[in-house]
Amino acid sequence: MSPQTETKASVGFKAGVKDYKLTYYTPQYKPLDTDILAAFRVTPQPGVPSEEAGAAVAAESSTGTWTTVWTDGLTSLDRYKGRCYHIDPVPGEENQYICYVAYPLDLFEEGSVTNMFTSIVGNVFGFKALRALRLEDLRVPISYIKTFQGPPHGIQVERDKLNKYGRPLLGCTIKPKLGLSAKNYGRAVYECLRGGLDFTKDDENVNSQPFMRWRDRFLFCAEALFKSQAETGEIKGHYLNATAGTCEEMMKRAVFARELGAPIVMHDYLTGGFTANTTLAHYCRDNGLLLHIHRAMHAVIDMQKNHGMQFRVLAKALRLSGGDHIHAGTVVGKLEGERDITLGFVDLLRDDHTEIDPDRGIYFTQSWVSTPGVLPVASGGIHVWHMPALTEIFGDDSVLQFGGGTLGHPWGNAPGAVANRVALEACVQARNEGRDLAREGATIIREASKWSPELAAACEVWKEIKFEFPAVDILDKKKS
């Protein structure tokens, strides 16, 4: 029997308090293929050894509590306990460590992100022995992944539904986000889609407020959708936000969207909750709806480098819970996002397999087997001058979403959409011809603007607009 296992049957029950590391720090342990692995950034309180801090995280997120209990003797701790099996000091930090914890698969309910997070990032984040705690990454085993449906459709199915290939998709968030009547809202949707966009979008906090009830919005948006499709000959979509105060109300809205013939609905997966999101994702697959996911509230969780949860974990959780798109930052826009870190979780969203990559903040090799990929959405403070960089950074399998960068055009909404479509087509053509978007991007946009007055006007309006603030969440310094 392992020396870490003390049960009533083996040694007799002894009341009292003992160090966590005596039971939960097991450096000799070799993780199993079926274990869920977690990498925590741990900042212990002064005087708390790293081994004790790592063991405390493993204990409090699995079977442990602050004192020995006699009911330990009624089960096998060796089978169910989490184990801190490796600790690395963080380079450049005096008292900070990456603690690796392995969790037996039996600790988690099948197909439930809610249960997985309740255990791994539950009460342990308020533990007094730690000054700060951050979950940097998870390795989800194939055996657990296969208990989830995942995204309703995935990248290839979405492209087939839309009949659009070889370029990023273009979107626009309708602004002002609050205050428009349903009819005026639908008018903006129509103008943007007619101008050349693939999608328009409800903002995350557009639900069913007194100035615009959800049913009215859905009806006017559906009218705009079908009218623009008839005029352009292209398949169009509007992300109808089904997020609501109850799961029942959320599902009622999704059902109505399907009855209208809408191709896509939307959900705020963090504020709405993983249980609601998984429920909606299952409905979307069964009924042919695409599912756009907004990450409202994510920065409360992931923006600080030392405490909370890195977005790559939330991205993996979304791929399990289900969504066809998710907002992933822009690198170049107004929202937080360091380039290498962003590309790391973009790979986790889209690829079937990712390897450990410290340069992108990826701590574990992750296989997704047959789970469909998710399209990353770049949105927030972007405009036509950003198009070359966005095309180069995110590639074809992405959605580039311009809200103010469409609706702020001096000539109106439709010309704003035209400007973005022309800029995108110019960048894709230049890339396909072998030109360097990173080096020649501005030249490519200027050349295209010579034969597009809409693009020329947009270039003039936003030529001085930049958001050059350093990212808060950056990669650790490399060891010398």
UniProtKB/Swiss-Prot annotation:
Role of this protein: RuBisCO catalyzes two reactions: the carboxylation of D-ribulose 1,5-bisphosphate, the primary event in carbon dioxide fixation, as well as the oxidative fragmentation of the pentose substrate in the photorespiration process. Both reactions occur simultaneously and in competition at the same active site.
Organism from which the protein derives: Rivina humilis
Co-factor note (free text): Binds 1 Mg(2+) ion per subunit.
Needed co-factor(s): Mg(2+)
Protein name: Ribulose bisphosphate carboxylase large chain
Note: The basic functional RuBisCO is composed of a large chain homodimer in a 'head-to-tail' conformation. In form I RuBisCO this homodimer is arranged in a barrel-like tetramer with the small subunits forming a tetrameric 'cap' on each end of the 'barrel'.
Superkingdom of the organism of origin: Eukaryota
Binding, Mg(2+): K201, D203, E204
Positions bound to substrate: N123, T173, K177, R295, H327, S379
Catalyzed chemical reaction(s): 2 (2R)-3-phosphoglycerate + 2 H(+) = D-ribulose 1,5-bisphosphate + CO2 + H2O; D-ribulose 1,5-bisphosphate + O2 = 2-phosphoglycolate + (2R)-3-phosphoglycerate + 2 H(+)
HAMAP family: RuBisCO_L_type1
